[in-house]
Each structure stands twice: as structure tokens, then as C-alpha cells.
Design a protein with these regions (language model features):
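Patatin-like phospholipase
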Residues: 2-96, 104-340
Length: 340
């Protein structure tokens, strides 16, 4: 495989009904405890050697669809941590951008890790910042975020991911065709460029080359891969969105720069130019499917104010706890949906 990403190297149980602030705090703290910080005087953080959360848990006959949204993925992180705490693991997960990164931790059975990383490194310019873009050509620092953190600072359990019974696909966009690229990731380490591509935002990221394909963020071509999920033949689909009801995407104000930057990829430019039409139409379809009872949607209950490169840890934690709360609130209905 030729992969080149153009970069340098109940308490154990969340609330089942309307949660209180105290319950949510306990649930969030419990999730974070899945990763252990170093002892004082220790040289490196070491991940606690715990069994993956999916160990000995039967999979639910359902698919999980995860929208992206950069730091808005904190909402998704909260939802998935609640699922893991309740031992809900789906047979198939498909994620875009931040949704793919959160999905990777879900597949590895690592509750707490997605939010831990975002909050812990939010103020570190090496993680996600315009300073990183100026220095490396990537706002989302590839060497730091995809190597130093998972390999040294807060180790990712690659073996747990490899052993996971959950099928996982990451979505990126092929620049030459303008179409979505759905890649089944079986080995997180060896196929990491597909995760990097999925979360490489246009203009502020270098193009990723993987198996001869030129790739960038999957949100441009398939922001919410519900159709992909349906094509698997599954009857149940849980969709986690990162925008509240009523959200409407506006035309891209940076299209002039996009056309200049990606002049060699006309199909990709077309996709960028008309993305707001496709996105808004997709959201309307999702709402119709939800009303018809064919899918189950979890989304923020109010407009999200967290920015794509948010550094305010209080806002990030609030959005994470909102995800926990919304998943807890909808849990009885979700159980009914899955049992029907």
C-alpha cells in the first residue's frame, strides 16, 4: 500500500433519564479516567492497560453515521462516550473528518479519549491552529496530532483497533473526481493517511496522497454519509449530527481562493462551489427519514457556538457534556428504536 500524507513525519453508567449537572460531571470524569496521566516525576504519559470497552459485548444490529465539524466533534465525543458507557456498539461505523477521528476511538473501545485529546491540547498551537498552518502548511498539525500524541504523549491502542469486531469506514474527497472516497480502515496505524485525509480541511491543509489518490476532507463530498450506510443493507441507522435543527449552510465566501488553489481539479472546485446546496438538501432528507422513523438522529439541541479551531476549553467541555446529556435524554427512545 502506497501511503503518503505530505507531512512530517453507571458511576460507571451515565444517567438514563434527564441528567443532572452532577451526573454528567461524574460521567465525563469516568470517561476521562479511561486514559491515565503520568505519575508525578514520570517521563511519559502511559495509557492505562484496560480491555477495550467492546470486549465481550454483543454488537447491536445497527449502523452509526458520524458527521464532521472539526472541534464541533466534541458533541459527537460526548454521544459516543455515553454509548460506550452503556455498552452500545454498532456493527458498522462510517465517519467524516472529526466524525472519523471520534469513530476511531469508538472502534478501539476507548471512552473519554476523543474529548481528552481535544481539551488537553486545545491551547497547544501544534495541535489545531493557524500558527500550525503557517509553520507546516496544515492547520491540524499532522506530526503532532497523528504521531506525537498517539505514539508518545497519549498512546492510542492500535492493537485494540485491529482486534475490534466493528467495521469502520473513513470518508474523504478525491480531488481528481470530486467524489467521496470510502475507505475501510482495518489497521489504524498503517492506514492512518486515510484518517488524516478525512480531516484535512480545504485551503488550510496539504493534499494527502494515498494509494495514488489525491484526497482532502470528506465533508466536501459527503458531509453525512447516511446513503453509504443504507447501501450496506442495514435496517437501523443512528446518525450523529454536529449542527442543530434549522441550521442552513451558506455559500462559501472563499471560493475565489478555492478556485486559485485547486485550479488543477475542476471537479473538486464544482463540489466546493455547490456544497451548500448539497448540504442543505442532505439535511432536509435526513429530517424526512427521521420523521418516517427509518433513522434515529442525535444532534445538538441548540445552535453550536464552538468554532472549527476553538481554543476555549470551557466551551469545548460544555459541548461535550451537551453530547452526553442529549444521548442520555434520548436513550429510552433509542432503545425502543433498536428493539423495534
Amino acid at each position: 500500500m502506497n501511503l503518503n500524507y505530505n507531512g512530517t513525519r453507571e458511576e460507571k453508567g451515565c444517567p438514563m433519564s434527564e441528567p443532572t449537572e452532577e451526573q454528567l460531571s461524574k460521567c465525563a470524569a469516568n470517561a476521562a479516567d479511561e486514559n491515565r496521566e503520568p505519575d508525578e516525576g514520570g517521563s511519559e504519559p502511559v495509557r492505562a492497560h484496560k480491555a477495550p470497552a467492546w470486549e465481550d459485548v454483543p454488537l447491536a444490529h445497527a449502523n452509526l453515521v458520524l458527521e464532521g465539524g472539526a472541534m464541533r466533534g466534541q458533541f459527537t465525543a460526548g454521544v459516543l462516550d455515553f454509548f460506550m458507557d452503556q455498552k452500545l456498539f454498532c456493527e458498522y461505523v462510517v465517519g467524516v473528518s472529526a466524525g472519523a477521528l471520534c469513530g476511531g476511538n469508538y472502534v478501539a473501545g476507548a471512552p473519554g479519549r476523543s474529548s481528552l485529546i481535544n481539551v488537553k491540547y486545545a491551547a497547544d498551537n501544534r495541535y489545531l491552529s493557524m500558527q500550525s498552518f503557517v509553520r507546516t502548511g496544515n492547520a491540524y498539525g499532522r506530526e503532532f496530532a497523528f504521531h506525537e500524541i498517539p505514539d508518545v504523549l497519549d498512546p492510542f491502542d492500535y492493537e485494540a483497533f485491529r482486534r475490534s469486531p466493528i467495521r469502520f469506514e473513513a470518508v474523504s474527497t478525491n480531488l481528481e473526481t470530486g467524489e467521496a472516497d470510502y475507505h475501510e480502515v482495518r489497521d489504524y496505524h498503517d492506514e492512518l493517511p486515510y484518517l488524516i485525509a478525512s480531516s484535512s480541511m480545504p485551503l488550510v491543509s496539504q493534499i494527502v496522497e494515498a494509494d495514488g489518490k489525491l484526497l482532502l476532507d470528506g465533508g466536501t463530498s459527503d458531509s453525512v454519509p447516511l446513503l453509504r450506510s443504507m447501501l450496506t443493507g442495514a435496517k437501523k441507522h443512528i446518525v450523529v449530527l454536529t449542527q442543530a435543527a434549522g441550521y442552513e449552510k451558506k455559500p462559501n465566501k472563499l471560493m475565489a481562493l478555492m478556485r486559485q488553489r485547486y485550479a488543477d481539479y475542476p471537479y473538486y472546485i464544482d463540489r466546493l462551489q455547490y456544497r451548500h446546496y448539497e448540504y442543505n438538501r442532505l439535511y432536509r432528507w435526513i429530517e424526512r427519514e427521521q420523521v418516517a422513523g427509518r433513522i434515529f438522529v442525535i444532534r445538538p439541541p441548540e445552535p453550536v457556538t464552538v468554532s472549527s479551531m476553538e481554543h476555549d476549553t470551557e466551551k469545548l467541555l460544555a459541548l461535550y457534556e451537551q453530547g452526553l446529556a442529549e444521548a442520555a435524554r434520548l436513550w429510552p427512545k433509542l432503545q425502543e428504536y433498536l428493539a423495534d
